[in-house]
Amino acid sequence: MFKRKSTAELAAQMAKLAGNKGGFSSEDKGEWKLKLDNAGNGQAVIRFLPSKNDEQAPFAILVNHGFKKNGKWYIENCSSTHGDYDSCPVCQYISKNDLYNTDNKEYGLVKRKTSYW
């Protein structure tokens, strides 16, 4: 499963990482930093810009299924997020068993949940 590596290679990698103190340069002039007052509080205004083309929605839509059945959890994103309604196994199960019309309790448990980000 795991291959043994030479300790010399590992020591060389560790030495290379040890030279990188802090992870990034704090001298970067292109990076914006929040200015703090004497109490340590900062304030910023975030402005949302319009999209480059008018066809894009200013938010993302995510459809998922999340439910507990037979003591086990099922939490997955639904392929209908991308318009593919046929490859989601839960949506297929709902359609095949016509849960909307036959078993509203189970349908309420397994139906798609839509969230907007």
Curated annotation (Swiss-Prot):
Protein name: Single-stranded DNA-binding protein
Keywords associated with the record: DNA damage, DNA recombination, DNA repair, DNA replication, DNA-binding, Metal-binding, Repressor, Viral DNA replication, Zinc
General function of this protein: Single-stranded DNA-binding protein that participates in viral DNA replication, recombination, and repair. Coats the lagging-strand ssDNA as the replication fork advances. Stimulates the activities of viral DNA polymerase and DnaB-like SF4 replicative helicase, probably via its interaction with the helicase assembly factor. Together with DnaB-like SF4 replicative helicase and the helicase assembly factor, promotes pairing of two homologous DNA molecules containing complementary single-stranded regions and mediates homologous DNA strand exchange. Also promotes the formation of joint molecules.
Gene designation per UniProt: 32
Listed transmembrane segments: none
Residue segments, region LAST: 3-7
Keyword Metal-binding (UniProt): yes
Family designation: Belongs to the Tequatrovirus single-stranded DNA-binding protein family.
Assembly notes: Homodimer in the absence of DNA, monomer when binding DNA. Interacts with the DNA helicase assembly protein; a ternary complex between the helicase assembly protein, the single-stranded DNA-binding protein and ssDNA is an obligatory intermediate in the helicase loading mechanism. Part of the replicase complex that includes the DNA polymerase, the polymerase clamp, the clamp loader complex, the single-stranded DNA binding protein, the primase, the DnaB-like SF4 replicative helicase and the helicase assembly factor. Interacts (via C-terminus) with the viral SF1 dDA helicase.
Gene Ontology terms, MF aspect: metal ion binding; single-stranded DNA binding
